[in-house]
Amino acid sequence: MIDPNLLRNNLAEVAATLKLKRNFILDTKELAELEEQRKALQVETETLQAKRNARSKAVGAAKARGENIAPLLAEMDDMGHELATVKAELDEILAELNTIALTIPNLPADEVPLGKDDSENKEISRWGTPRQFDFEIKDHVTLGENLAGGIDFAAGAKLSGARFAVMKGQVAKMHRALAQFMLDLHTEQHGYTETYVPYLVNHTTLYGTGQLPKFGEDLFHTTPLEGEVPYALIPTAEVPVTNLVRDEILNTEDLPIRMTAHTPCFRSEAGSYGRDTRGLIRMHQFDKVEMVQIVDPDKSMEALEELTAHAEKVLQLLGLPYRKMLLCTGDMGFGSCKTYDLEVWVPAQDTYREISSCSNMWDFQARRMQARCRSKTDKKTRLVHTLNGSGLAVGRTLVAVLENYQNEDGSVTVPEVLRPYMGGLEVIGK
């Protein structure tokens, strides 16, 4: 949620920025009318409250003098009813303003390039050189289906439907090894605290990080029993991990807080019909190691560079070529003010594919969550800044390893950094 003071004091400017950079049309007339009503009702509420307080003091004084206070009490009672009515009207207007505010995307940072879609993202750097194969390469589906145990897409479809898979044997072991390797790297070298979180969360949590109300159709929702709250399966560990600081006032001196979690993620892929229907690239259920940072609001841009470097380190240690992209305004996530995507080289597709998205959410999520910090030398609180990034998507990393480390006979060499997690295994055979 963007700062409501920006909407109140710079409505036209904010609306113009949202239209230009986010292709978002803000109804300024409706907002201005609601804001006028809010101000009028706020003044009326405060005036009535002051009058009622004055009458309350008058009652006390009259009672002390032994006077009849019945007329004053009746007057106070009338004021109370009037005050309750005005407060109810004010609450209704505030709710309408809040509903609108929840639909407004974050404002991009000044350095984010203007663009309509991913074709206008800016390449920042590349690492590694794509391998030149001297044999006809196979994609991860063909490789996975023919490795020992391997990947069974038919079994996934039988159990659940499209966009599910079953892994067995050494491929399943490599999938687990990748997640363990990522967690160990982030906790032992990058300073993150490993966190285990629920996979089902309530709607308050989803509002906190911005999944609701805009992205409800992308979630898998439970059907609650009578008297129970509805839940949704997490689309990313960002949701529960970031919400750990909801309604908290943190010591600024204790920041940054770095947390990481390995979880399954569940997405309906509502807007992805027909895209990546083959293989592990786009699944309804996939594993991811997520990194979250809660930082001093003056230090979030440097934290974004650090967070992104932590994700890059995973790819570098695995020896996987990748490129770093700065997303343009038209390709950024709803709550982000600046995002880097890391795209790994996928040989069978002869292109780079997203494997990590690292974002600075500024105070957008913190305002929704009321997550604040306060210095020991200053009584004033400030909204923290929140950041998140994939470190990495495990399934897509498996895709990249299988394809980049494949051999002519269909076997796959195990990257050296994974071998300690796989009992010293050097090659996954057929």
Swiss-Prot record:
<comment type="pathway">
    <text>Aminoacyl-tRNA biosynthesis; selenocysteinyl-tRNA(Sec) biosynthesis; L-seryl-tRNA(Sec) from L-serine and tRNA(Sec): step 1/1.</text>
</comment>
<comment type="function">
    <text>Catalyzes the attachment of serine to tRNA(Ser). Is also able to aminoacylate tRNA(Sec) with serine, to form the misacylated tRNA L-seryl-tRNA(Sec), which will be further converted into selenocysteinyl-tRNA(Sec).</text>
</comment>
<dbReference type="GO" id="GO:0016260">
    <property type="term" value="P:selenocysteine biosynthetic process"/>
</dbReference>
<protein>
    <recommendedName>
        <fullName>Serine--tRNA ligase</fullName>
        <ecNumber>6.1.1.11</ecNumber>
    </recommendedName>
</protein>
<dbReference type="GO" id="GO:0005524">
    <property type="term" value="F:ATP binding"/>
</dbReference>
<dbReference type="InterPro" id="IPR002314">
    <property type="entry name" value="aa-tRNA-synt_IIb"/>
</dbReference>
<dbReference type="GO" id="GO:0006434">
    <property type="term" value="P:seryl-tRNA aminoacylation"/>
</dbReference>
<keyword id="KW-0030">Aminoacyl-tRNA synthetase</keyword>
<dbReference type="InterPro" id="IPR042103">
    <property type="entry name" value="SerRS_1_N_sf"/>
</dbReference>
<keyword id="KW-0547">Nucleotide-binding</keyword>
<dbReference type="GO" id="GO:0004828">
    <property type="term" value="F:serine-tRNA ligase activity"/>
</dbReference>
<keyword id="KW-0648">Protein biosynthesis</keyword>
<dbReference type="InterPro" id="IPR015866">
    <property type="entry name" value="Ser-tRNA-synth_1_N"/>
</dbReference>
<dbReference type="Pfam" id="PF00587">
    <property type="entry name" value="tRNA-synt_2b"/>
</dbReference>
<dbReference type="InterPro" id="IPR045864">
    <property type="entry name" value="aa-tRNA-synth_II/BPL/LPL"/>
</dbReference>
<feature type="binding site">
    <location>
        <begin position="236"/>
        <end position="238"/>
    </location>
    <ligand>
        <name>L-serine</name>
    </ligand>
</feature>
<comment type="subunit">
    <text>Homodimer. The tRNA molecule binds across the dimer.</text>
</comment>
<keyword id="KW-0067">ATP-binding</keyword>
<dbReference type="InterPro" id="IPR002317">
    <property type="entry name" value="Ser-tRNA-ligase_type_1"/>
</dbReference>
<dbReference type="Pfam" id="PF02403">
    <property type="entry name" value="Seryl_tRNA_N"/>
</dbReference>
<dbReference type="InterPro" id="IPR006195">
    <property type="entry name" value="aa-tRNA-synth_II"/>
</dbReference>
<dbReference type="InterPro" id="IPR010978">
    <property type="entry name" value="tRNA-bd_arm"/>
</dbReference>
<comment type="similarity">
    <text>Belongs to the class-II aminoacyl-tRNA synthetase family. Type-1 seryl-tRNA synthetase subfamily.</text>
</comment>
<keyword id="KW-0963">Cytoplasm</keyword>
<dbReference type="InterPro" id="IPR033729">
    <property type="entry name" value="SerRS_core"/>
</dbReference>
<feature type="binding site">
    <location>
        <position position="390"/>
    </location>
    <ligand>
        <name>L-serine</name>
    </ligand>
</feature>
<feature type="binding site">
    <location>
        <begin position="267"/>
        <end position="269"/>
    </location>
    <ligand>
        <name>ATP</name>
    </ligand>
</feature>
<feature type="binding site">
    <location>
        <begin position="354"/>
        <end position="357"/>
    </location>
    <ligand>
        <name>ATP</name>
    </ligand>
</feature>
<dbReference type="GO" id="GO:0005737">
    <property type="term" value="C:cytoplasm"/>
</dbReference>
<keyword id="KW-0436">Ligase</keyword>
<feature type="binding site">
    <location>
        <position position="290"/>
    </location>
    <ligand>
        <name>L-serine</name>
    </ligand>
</feature>
